[in-house]
A protein has these predicted regions:
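Soluble FAD-dependent oxygen oxidases
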Residues: 1-121
Length: 121
């Protein structure tokens, strides 16, 4: 599952950070379910901010199970006026899912610093 949203005329910085907080508050639940979320918060032109998920990887789960797991998050976002367009896919194998979700990429640069974090339960 992949999606993105950002600040705009209808999404204030305050609303954006409330949405990020709603995601962060659910880390223990998503971690316990064995999910892997590859995401970033980015600063754009002016004071624009964006959040991108590329992808939300849920090994050993069906798409229906992942949608059920994330339903409350997407409801909270909808209540905040955020309805990201979600790209979904389901795969028969770990390798197939990994290959579809994690393209090779250049990481980091002069204005970007990439880091990984492990959040304990």
């Amino acid at each position: 599952m992949s999606f993105a949203f950002g600040t705009s005329e209808t999404i204030s910085h305050e609303t954006f950070w409330k949405a990020i907080r709603a995601f962060w508050e659910r880390f223990p639940t998503f971690n316990k379910a064995g999910n892997y979320e590859y995401w970033g918060v980015f600063h754009g032109e002016g004071d624009a901010l964006s959040f991108a998920m590329f992808p939300w990887f849920a090994p050993n789960h069906t798409l229906a199970e992942l949608k059920n797991l994330t339903a409350s998050l997407f409801k909270d976002w909808k209540d905040l006026g955020i309805e990201p367009e979600v790209t979904e896919s389901e795969h028969d194998s770990f390798l197939g899912a990994w290959s579809a979700g994690f393209a090779r990429e250049a990481v980091g640069g002069a204005s970007t610093k990439t880091a990984g974090r492990l959040f304990p339960r």
